């Protein structure tokens, strides 16, 4: 990639905005009547969308018409990618750099364009929080405001519940390799089935759940498509930890106790609920004001 000194002001703007995003998000950058992708994103996007890869000077690029963006975004999400939409915030003026901002970050479990969603079922983002043989599960549909959490015992019961609700995207503690194996269609080892939920907090913010995307604690740590139909994303372990998750959920609902939600001593369920809220607000920068109950 070219250095900042070699870039035009617009391309330097692109690089700055790109650097502030989750590392696995493709950036669609509004440029007139098109959304453009540049550098590595252009190479990836051109391959996934089967569009022409061209160059702007020495910079690889590909573009899609702004009026067809929903269809193209749907294809990227179906391929398991996150997509950041960067729009022009003012009219273009000769000789001046247009102000641009990321207006939304979409993922397979949070896309709500009605034309892309199947009306017969929810479009859930789910979180899995393991604590020995207990699994905390949380499900969010931003389209409807549905927010549910539960606990189940054993690998089979966890998979059964996940397959029943069929989330489009699923996050789990990234260091829990056995859980990843299970969610990919394998099984966990006996040692991991006995492992309790780690009582850790964020090293950077004291467990307050406010880390920005790209900083420690707000990072995506690997994704994969699965035979179950969901996109699997590893996420930082501390986000699922009891103290952090409890703080995150209480802060969201503006309460001092979760007893009224039926979550007393439901540590794994709270871990999943806190993780899914953190992923939405910190990693994807989404507005979750419509999640008013659980």
What are the language-model segments listed below?
Residues 1-195, 218-294:
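Charged catalytic and DNA/RNA-contacting regions of genome-maintenance
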Residues 197-199, 203-210, 215-219, 224:
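A cross-taxon signal for low-complexity, glycine/charged-rich
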